[in-house]
A protein has these predicted regions:
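Membrane-interfacial helix-loop segments of redox and metal-homeostasis proteins
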Residues: 2-182
Length: 182
């Protein structure tokens, strides 16, 4: 624990104690951008997969697995299949990997220069959706509560800008890149 006496020692040694974050994490909702549209599409696929698995056949959990694996893939590589379709249709991204001056990319790649809050969300949600899809398929349909909740929460997140997981990571010190200052 840092006290007044050893705060100066820690600062002199190059370690700066972090202040506890206050406030809430809210994404930019005054404009529509590529990442928000990807979240809406993922939420629709999650809710459709949950509903079809529940009402028709539990093999529809493959839609949930697809969203989960895609989310993990995006967090690790920066390449998003749905994002690239939207990019080709002219939707502007916020988290696009920066290019050299004057360059124009024909592919959308999310920033992967370092781990930041939004990348953590892609990874955490992707892993949890992937194992949940397998549990839905091979164990019990009760596991559909989780992807249905994630789908509904993602719609709320995309429209209101508020996400429970994002706020938790924000409070833990993850660097936000889509946050508005409150």
């Amino acid at each position: 624990m840092l006290t007044n006496g050893n705060v100066q020692d820690a600062t002199l040694n190059g370690v700066r104690p972090r202040k506890k974050r206050t406030g809430i994490y809210i994404i930019k909702t005054h404009i529509w951008y590529l990442e928000r549209l990807v979240w809406i599409i993922a939420a629709i696929v999650l809710m459709m997969g949950s509903l079809l698995s529940l009402l028709h056949n539990h093999n529809w959990a493959v839609l949930i697995l697809g969203v989960g694996l895609s989310s993990v893939f995006v967090s690790l590589t920066g390449f998003c299949f749905v994002g690239n379709i939207l990019y080709r249709l002219g939707v502007k991204p916020i988290l696009e990997r920066p290019l050299k001056q004057g360059e124009k990319s024909k592919y959308y790649l999310m920033q992967t220069d370092r781990w930041y809050l939004e990348r953590y969300i892609y990874l955490i949600v992707g892993i949890n959706l992937s194992w949940t899809a397998l549990l839905v398929r091979f164990h019990s349909l009760w596991w559909l509560c989780f992807p249905a909740f994630v789908g509904a929460a993602t719609v709320v997140f995309a429209f209101t800008g508020f996400c429970i997981l994002a706020n938790t990571l924000y409070r833990l010190g993850a660097e936000p890149r889509l946050c508005i200052n409150l």
